[in-house]
């Protein structure tokens, strides 16, 4: 007895060949648009257009107009593997993912936390860094020794981030209400923290560790981190899997040849072991 599924597949394949022949002869028009070939387009023009928010040190920052950070060095190395150049776009964080969906650029290289909801909408690369949510306080504040000590206090964070969402969930379980202030970017939150207008800032542990290392007289990280273990990745569109596969292959190669560790040590002060596949998110 013939396998119905195999037979249907064979028939579909034959039909595609017939339609392809008719289309090449100009006898029929395509009923549906061709699948996206962003990787092919990138290689044809010799340029990858990548977007981020250059207000997220140590991953992305603008130093007197010069783009620097973990993502800059990583994407340059990836582009070299792909044989193309990179064009960088600096956008507000709240415009980055909508811009990707609107096809205004090829890839998001801003660190995006892998979450269950985002996995439904975007294609993620393998992780590039830890994204676990943590808190930072003023260095001289003795009233906060652990995350639970923010009960009854004011904490700031960047609007639209998973770290802010995790803060709200964490705060809801504390005995006293926490006032949560939302900011356009983390630098504004840090400025208000230093000025005493808020009591703590939320961000990923690597971001906070970097900020505290830059200003040890002003800031201190509150340990342990309170969030679920999570990771940052780059993001593409769901129909651009060939691009994501190529980027992943490059990232895995850079991890294997020591390039990833070198970049991590430069910006984080240490190398970090990361998964070489996209992990199942816990949030």
Language-model regions: role of each:
Residues 1-27:
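N-terminal secretory signal peptides
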Residues 37-111:
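Extracytoplasmic small-molecule ligand-binding "clamshell" domains
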Residues 54, 129-137, 209-248, 270-283:
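Periplasmic-binding protein-like
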Residues 61-62, 75-84, 163-182, 212-216:
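Ligand-binding cleft/hinge of the Venus flytrap
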Residues 73-81, 141, 148, 153-154, ...:
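Extended ligand-binding regions for polar small-molecule ligands
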Residues 80, 85-149:
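Acidic, polar ligand-binding/catalytic clefts
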Residues 94-95, 112-120, 166-171, 194, ...:
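A ligand-binding cleft/hinge motif common to bilobed small-molecule-binding domains
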Residues 162-180, 220-221, 252-283:
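Ligand-binding clefts/hinges and TM-proximal coupling segments of bilobed small-molecule sensing domains
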């Amino acid at each position: 007895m013939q396998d119905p599924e195999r037979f249907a597949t064979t028939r579909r394949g034959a039909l595609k060949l017939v339609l392809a022949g008719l289309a090449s002869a100009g006898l029929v028009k395509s009923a549906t648009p061709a699948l996206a070939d962003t990787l092919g387009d990138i290689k044809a023009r010799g340029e990858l257009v990548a977007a981020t928010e250059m207000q997220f040190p140590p991953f992305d920052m603008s130093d007197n107009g010069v783009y620097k950070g973990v993502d800059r060095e990583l994407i340059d190395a990836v582009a070299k593997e792909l044989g193309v150049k990179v064009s960088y776009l600096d956008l507000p964080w709240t415009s980055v993912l909508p811009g990707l969906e609107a096809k205004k650029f090829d890839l998001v290289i801003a660190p995006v936390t892998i979450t269950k909801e985002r996995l439904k909408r975007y294609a993620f690369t393998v992780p590039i860094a830890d994204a676990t949510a943590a808190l930072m306080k003023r260095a001289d504040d003795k009233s906060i020794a652990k995350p639970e000590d923010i009960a009854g206090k004011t904490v700031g964070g960047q609007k639209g981030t998973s770290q802010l969402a995790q803060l709200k969930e964490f705060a809801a379980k504390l005995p006293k209400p926490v006032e949560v202030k939302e900011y356009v970017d983390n630098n504004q939150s840090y400025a208000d923290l230093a000025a005493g207008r808020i009591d703590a800032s939320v961000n990923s542990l690597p971001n906070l560790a970097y900020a505290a290392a830059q200003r040890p007289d002003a800031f201190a990280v509150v340990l342990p981190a309170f969030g679920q273990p999570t990771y940052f990745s780059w993001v593409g569109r769901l129909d651009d899997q060939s691009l994501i596969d190529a980027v992943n292959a490059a990232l895995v190669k850079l991890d294997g040849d020591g390039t990833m560790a070198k970049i991590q040590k430069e910006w984080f002060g240490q190398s970090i072991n990361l998964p070489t596949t996209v992990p199942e998110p816990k949030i």
